[in-house]
Regions:
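Helix-loop-helix junctions that connect adjacent transmembrane segments
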Residues: 3, 25-29, 68, 145-151, ...
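Membrane-helix boundary/coupling elements in multi-pass transport proteins
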Residues: 118-131, 239-246, 306-344, 390-394, ...
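TM-loop-TM module centered on a large, flexible mid-protein loop between adjacent transmembrane helices
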Residues: 100-103, 107, 140-144, 259-322, ...
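Membrane-interface "cap" regions at the ends of multi-pass membrane proteins
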Residues: 2-66, 78-79, 83, 94-95, ...
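Transmembrane helix-loop junctions in multi-pass membrane proteins
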Residues: 49-56, 165-171, 304-305, 367-390, ...
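A generic transmembrane alpha-helix motif of multi-pass inner-membrane proteins
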Residues: 199, 396-414, 420-476
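Membrane-interface loop-to-helix entry segments
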Residues: 12, 150-204, 258-263, 399-402, ...
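Extracellular loop-to-transmembrane helix junctions
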Residues: 28-34, 53-150, 154, 261-264, ...
Length: 476
């Protein structure tokens, strides 16, 4: 096996085990390439493409060209980062992809804090957001209020239900991921193809790209806000690496899944935005708000189709929530199996019947529920101080992309056997992309970004105390 220098030669014994055999930690090789691709595509393509489209247009003052540029910029950053991680995935396999790569690059300490952040902030904020949004679209579909307690309880039921499936039926969770991914692509491909054809015929597509906005020149920060907003629509692809210890032939299949999945997502997003231009003017798109998918498909295929597409959207959101929960359910396990975090032996246990870390899954359900309460009562309804009302679906990208940078630098330093393109050019481009994303987040949110960082520091300090306590116990 080709190895890096001292840092990247840390592959554990699990990397050499034959396919189909259980790892020493007990997790089974249960997933194949299509499940991994479905993780990437299915997690990324969810609610974001539907409910962030109007926000992107609004930030760009209705300019479709700039909106498409937004989609392309964030997509390019995702592609470059996924290619770099695909390179890492072909060389290192242990328990939880991104945490494994952090450990290989910078040691156990850095890996611990990455895993702590992913487990307590990144996974659960996305899960809670998607559960709430899924309930919102279900409310639009079935006609119940989308801001009241009915909405709240449906979202919570979706969250807990997904968690229980992942805890007690992990194979079913994988099958759901594959099936919902196939279903969610149907409306997007239809809009991309039919919408573009209709738009070129009725002139709306040409109009969307030629009509100049009167406000563009006076609002230079619009693109930054649009980039941060649409970053959510691309988020979650890294979670596919959380199943690498359960993926058959992971060193071959995970790189393929990351690369192919990312390409599929970017192509579909770009085509979907172009397709939207054939259904209505950009001003009407912005005015439609969360009802944009229903109105766009209604204009294209008739009012009945507008209703049917909401069924697809709800299924799409359910699939994304499931994929995110697959990562959240394994967060505490990725710490416990390294003898790190809270009660490591308890969370490292794997159920012999299901081959799943059930205790870890329950921890994920509880943390996701706490974040769901925050999302509903603090962020949506503002029932807290202003410094604790930052947007949880967008701001964690600051620390996520910042965490990638040291890993990419380590790759450049230690990957001596790699060709210059993989060793220097791709990681450098990825670092620049990460820095750009962090800058955009600060430019768009300013004081709210600082509030989030304050919270992040507190969570990391708690993690430091937990790690210090564990280390002292180990020495006794």
């Amino acid at each position: 096996m080709k190895k890096y220098g001292t840092s990247y030669g840390m592959a554990c014994d699990n990397s050499f085990r034959k396919e189909g055999t259980p790892l020493e930690n007990g997790m089974q090789k249960r997933y194949g390439l299509f499940t991994a691709i479905s993780m990437v595509v299915g997690i990324v393509i969810g609610s974001g493409i539907f409910f962030k489209a109007t926000k992107v247009l609004a930030n760009n003052n209705g300019d479709m060209g700039r909106s498409l540029l937004t989609v392309a910029i964030v997509g390019a950053i995702m592609l470059i980062c996924s290619f770099v991680f695909a390179n890492l995935a072909s060389r290192y396999e242990k328990v939880n992809g991104v945490v494994d790569y952090a450990e290989a690059a910078l040691g156990r300490g850095y890996a611990y804090y990455v895993a702590w952040f992913m487990t307590l902030i990144y996974y659960p904020t996305l899960v809670s957001c998607l559960a709430w949004i899924t309930a919102q679209y279900a409310g639009i579909l079935f006609g119940f209020p989308i801001t009241g307690m009915t909405h709240f309880w449906i979202g919570l039921a979706i969250l807990v239900g997904d968690g229980l499936i992942n805890a007690y039926a992990p194979k079913l969770a994988g099958k759901l991921q594959v099936s919902t991914t196939a279903i969610k692509l149907v409306p997007l491909v239809l809009m991309a193809v039919v919408g573009t054809i209709v738009g070129l015929s009725n002139g709306l597509t040409v109009q969307a790209f030629t009509a100049a906005s009167q406000q563009i020149a006076s609002q230079g920060s619009g693109l930054m806000g649009a980039i941060v907003a649409f970053a959510f629509a691309y988020e979650g692809w890294i979670i596919a690496t959380s199943i690498n210890s359960e993926l058959k032939d992971a060193k071959k299949n995970l790189p393929l899944a990351l690369s192919l999945g990312a390409l599929i997502v970017v192509a579909i997003y770009m085509a979907y935005f172009v397709g939207l231009t054939g259904t209505m003017t950009t001003a009407d798109m912005m005015a439609a708000g969360d009802l944009l998918p229903e109105k766009a498909f209604g204009n294209l295929f008739g009012s009945a189709a507008g209703t049917v597409v909401f069924v697809f959207i709800v299924i799409s959101c359910l699939g994304t929530t499931n994929g995110l929960m697959m990562g959240a359910a394994r967060g505490a396990y990725s710490l416990g199996v390294r003898n790190e975090g809270i009660a490591p032996r308890f969370f490292a246990k794997v159920d012999q019947k299901t081959g799943m870390a059930t205790n870890s899954a329950w921890f994920g359900i509880i943390i996701c529920t706490l974040w769901y309460l925050y999302w509903h009562f603090f962020f949506i309804h503002g029932m807290g101080p202003s410094f604790f009302n930052w947007e949880p679906d967008e701001l964690p990208i600051i620390t996520l992309y910042a965490a990638y940078i040291p890993m990419f630098i380590s790759l450049m330093v230690n990957a001596r056997e790699e060709k210059p393109f993989k060793r220097f050019i791709l990681p450098t481009a990825a670092i620049l992309g990460c820095c750009f994303m962090v800058y955009c987040a600060f430019a768009a949110y300013r004081i709210q970004a600082l509030y989030y960082l304050g919270f992040f520091v507190v969570v990391m300090l708690i993690g430091a105390v937990v790690r210090s306590t564990n280390n002292k116990k180990a020495k006794v």
